[in-house]
Amino acid sequence: RAQGKYIFFFDSDDTLAPDTVKSIIDYFDTVYDEVDLVTYRITQYFKNAPPVYHFRYRTLTHTGVYDLDDPKNRFITQTNVNICVKNDKNNGIFFDESPGFRHEDEKYCCDILRRKMKIGFCQKGEYRYNRNNENSIVSTVFSPYYIFETSMAFYEELFNSFGGRVPPYFQGIVFNDLRWKLKEDKLLPYHYSPEEFARANRRI
């Protein structure tokens, strides 16, 4: 079990910029009572291609605390492990380890953020996401054959958990997932029968 004040997460084939840990900790200390999670820039690196940045950085333009109840922040959509969280042993929030779930990072962030509906962002530091691994989860099992039903069930459960109006931020979470899967042709379950495919489209 982690013993420090904060927890960082890190995938084995990714790297951090040298100043990342100190920069994030120094900033988190200044907003400790306001937020439970601080995010920082994630950059996708592909072989022989320019770095790719998520559209959330059109909103996250400066170091500070962002109100997730404000509709203009609905596309921050924190879904990856480029985060630092408090080492709170009593909050009861853990990664969902259900076999084949594939949304564990996203759900973990949602569970933490919905408590205060605020997120901290530090401009310093960088999570360097290696997209060159052809054997990664995203490259191998992030296809509708494996995750369409799981993804839909997760988002239906997420929306239902609000018992009515869904905050724009969480609507943005779903929009983000649909957007990138459509772009990479990983959304629609083409392997379904025509009847099942039509039903799946209505469900989306």
Functional labels for PLM-detected ranges:
Residues 3-4, 78-93:
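Conserved nucleotide-sugar donor-binding
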Residues 62-85:
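A recurrent flexible, glycine/aromatic-enriched loop bordering the glycosyltransferase active site
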Residues 101-108:
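Acidic donor-binding loop at a coil-to-helix junction in glycosyltransferase catalytic cores
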Residues 15, 19-55:
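Conserved donor NDP-sugar-binding/catalytic core segment of glycosyltransferases
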Residues 10-12, 96:
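Active-site acidic Asp-centered loop
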Residues 99-101, 121-153, 184-198:
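Nucleotide-sugar-dependent glycosyltransferase catalytic core
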Residues 164-168, 173-204:
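Terminal low-complexity segments of carbohydrate-biosynthetic enzymes
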Residues 7:
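Short aromatic/hydrophobic "clamp" motif used to bind/position activated sugar donors
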